[in-house]
């Protein structure tokens, strides 16, 4: 499973990139809105200068024709831009049109397997099932990863699964075990993955022994 960082903060992206494991970035309007004094397109240019893997940039429009035009403009920013499209009927139309133009797409806000299958059939490069938000309403978001992976394997679909709305390290482990191709997560979760109390204890013991 590959690691994406879910942020529009350029300092966090640089920090994640320095770890040597970063394969891409996902952004959304809420994350971009937190970034003051920079335009959306300028921030995307900054991000694509740092990260050479996929950078998902979400459209704001909700009508198919407007999403298509917005997606084409976003794709001009850099060759590694992936246009992020919400899972709606108009979104599917936009995905098909952009795919036919050779533009990569990431269908977001996936909450059931039927939505993922529709997105894949429309030509989506990626689908993003949301784990944490399903957990919030009493569902098991990880079961959705398993369902989507099984359906895609049965039908030979190449669309990749991005496990999104990851809240903690256990989400990462389980998403990887269930076959997600990518996990996108906040920087704090990436850092949490590096930690274990026995690792810290072992380092302390090694240093204590060395300094005897």
From Swiss-Prot:
**Phosphoserine PTM sites in chain numbering:** 39
Segments forming a coiled coil: none
Recorded hits in InterPro entries, A to Z, give: Aldolase_TIM, TAL/FSA, Transaldolase_3B, Transaldolase_3B/F6P_aldolase, Transaldolase_AS, TSA/FSA_arc/bac
Reaction(s) catalyzed by this protein? Answer: D-sedoheptulose 7-phosphate + D-glyceraldehyde 3-phosphate = D-erythrose 4-phosphate + beta-D-fructose 6-phosphate
Task: Name the keywords, alphabetized.
Answer: Cytoplasm, Pentose shunt, Phosphoprotein, Schiff base, Transferase
State the superkingdom: Bacteria
Tell me the SUPFAM superfamilies matching this sequence.
Aldolase
Recorded family membership? Belongs to the transaldolase family. Type 3B subfamily.
Q: So what does this one do?
A: Transaldolase is important for the balance of metabolites in the pentose-phosphate pathway. Does not show fructose-6-P aldolase activity.
Q: What is this protein called?
A: Transaldolase
> What is the species of this protein?
Bacillus subtilis (strain 168)
């Amino acid at each position: 499973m590959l690691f994406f960082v879910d942020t529009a903060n350029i300092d966090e992206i640089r920090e994640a990139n320095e770890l040597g494991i970063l394969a891409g970035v996902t952004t959304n309007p809420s994350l971009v809105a937190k970034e003051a004094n920079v335009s959306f397109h300028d921030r995307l240019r900054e991000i694509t200068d740092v990260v050479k893997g996929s950078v998902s940039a979400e459209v704001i429009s909700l009508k198919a024709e407007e999403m298509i035009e917005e997606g084409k403009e976003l794709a001009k920013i850099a060759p590694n831009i992936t246009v992020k499209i919400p899972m709606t009927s108009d979104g599917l139309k936009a995905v098909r049109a952009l795919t036919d133009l050779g533009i990569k797409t990431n269908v977001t806000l996936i909450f059931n397997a039927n939505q993922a299958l529709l997105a894949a059939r429309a030509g989506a490069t990626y689908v993003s099932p949301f784990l944490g938000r399903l957990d919030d309403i009493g569902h098991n978001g990880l079961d959705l990863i398993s369902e989507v992976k099984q359906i895609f394997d049965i039908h030979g679909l190449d669309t990749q699964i991005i496990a999104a709305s990851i809240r903690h390290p256990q989400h990462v482990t389980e998403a990887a075990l269930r076959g997600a191709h990518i996990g996108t997560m906040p920087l704090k979760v990436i850092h949490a993955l590096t930690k274990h109390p026995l690792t810290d204890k072992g380092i302390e013991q090694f240093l204590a022994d060395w300094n005897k």
